Amino acid sequence: MRSSPIICALDMMDITRALEVTKAISGKVAMVKLGLEFFTAYGITGVRQVIELGVPVFLDLKLHDIPNTVVRAIHSVKDLNIAMLTIHVSGGKDMMRAAADALSDTNILLAGVTVLTSIGGDDFIDFGIHESLESHVMRLVGLAVDAGLRAVVCSAHEVGVIRGRYPDITLVVPGIRFNSGVDDQKRTKTPMDALSDGANYLVVGRPVTQSPDPLAAIDEILRSIGVH
């Protein structure tokens, strides 16, 4: 049996519910993701509470600031024994290199966020970016690789082309859905689509966290991708 590629996003404000879900799905997921909502509400203390349950934690802070500020932020969390941390690739090579250097003495996987899955082609027009979304994502992935990052966060729509050019990079894919609703994310695909294209990790949130039975929801997801 292959290991679970699922990362469960605990994007909720209620730490009690977050801990309940984490306990329920322990052993069925690769990691749980704690994002900005959770971190601003519960901070390092809340992260520690989740880590103590024994499930690897992906701290999704999407850091984006001048290099020194990002490095100081990383030093504040690097001793938490988290599994993965995110920064924005658009912060630039200097910021990414500084972040990678700050984590060089740890086993934390630093992942660069390319373009948020809530962003679509119309947004690029508003931003004044005169290239396709896919071309821009590939440009950002190239910058991340040049800066020494070994992982990026991208939409499922870019997985295939990224995997074709960078066969060794770790691809973390949000925007995974099981029905036609896309919520606040525009660039979505099914789990099997993303895995077939070369994704390493799939980030799934609401289908699990809003289920009355999170364990059953995870089991259904794993069955759908052939992991039992």
Swiss-Prot record:
It catalyses: orotidine 5'-phosphate + H(+) = UMP + CO2. GO terms for molecular function: orotidine-5'-phosphate decarboxylase activity. Keywords: Decarboxylase, Lyase, Pyrimidine biosynthesis. The active site is at K62 (proton donor). It comes from the Bacteria. Pathway: Pyrimidine metabolism; UMP biosynthesis via de novo pathway; UMP from orotate: step 2/2. GO terms for cellular component: cytosol. Its EC number is 4.1.1.23. One of its GO terms (biological process) is 'de novo' pyrimidine nucleobase biosynthetic process. Substrate binds at residues 11, 33, 60-69, 117, 177, 185, 205-206. Gene3D superfamilies: Aldolase class I. Homodimer. Belongs to the OMP decarboxylase family. Type 1 subfamily. Catalyzes the decarboxylation of orotidine 5'-monophosphate (OMP) to uridine 5'-monophosphate (UMP). This is Orotidine 5'-phosphate decarboxylase. It comes from Anaplasma marginale (strain St. Maries). The lineage of its organism: Bacteria, Pseudomonadati, Pseudomonadota, Alphaproteobacteria, Rickettsiales.
